[in-house]
Amino acid sequence: MGSFSIWHWLIVLAVVLLLFGRGKIPELMGDVAKGIKNFKQGMADEDAKEDPRTIDAKAEEPVKDVKKTTKS
């Protein structure tokens, strides 16, 4: 009941081959690889395009304490 035997894995493999066929599985794996490659390339492009920015602002006076008037 704990782990699957070799027969379980062979049956799963046979079902997958029947559903997808022999030629479809390599196509799916190629599409997954292309997706991963495009994702990595997009992340690298995003990092390269973004220039560091500075904030030009003046410091304001700190906010004074406000007395709470709510009743508990």
UniProtKB/Swiss-Prot annotation:
GO MF terms here are: protein transmembrane transporter activity
* Gene3D superfamilies hit by this protein: 1.20.5.3310
Q: Which UniProt keywords apply?
A: Cell inner membrane, Cell membrane, Membrane, Protein transport, Translocation, Transmembrane, Transmembrane helix, Transport
Name the segments for region: Disordered: 43-72
Query: What does the UniProt entry say about where the protein is found?
Result: Cell inner membrane
What's its membrane topology? Single-pass membrane protein
Query: Under the cellular component aspect of Gene Ontology, which terms does the record hold?
Result: TAT protein transport complex
Q: What Gene Ontology terms for biological process does this UniProt record contain?
A: protein transport by the Tat complex
Compositionally biased tracts (Basic and acidic residues): 50-72
Q: What is its main location?
A: membrane
Bilayer-crossing regions: 1-21
Q: What family does the entry list?
A: Belongs to the TatA/E family.
The job of this chain, per UniProt, is described as:
Part of the twin-arginine translocation (Tat) system that transports large folded proteins containing a characteristic twin-arginine motif in their signal peptide across membranes. TatA could form the protein-conducting channel of the Tat system.
Q: How does it assemble?
A: The Tat system comprises two distinct complexes: a TatABC complex, containing multiple copies of TatA, TatB and TatC subunits, and a separate TatA complex, containing only TatA subunits. Substrates initially bind to the TatABC complex, which probably triggers association of the separate TatA complex to form the active translocon.
Protein's UniProt name: Sec-independent protein translocase protein TatA
**Organism in which the protein naturally occurs:** Brucella canis (strain ATCC 23365 / NCTC 10854 / RM-666)
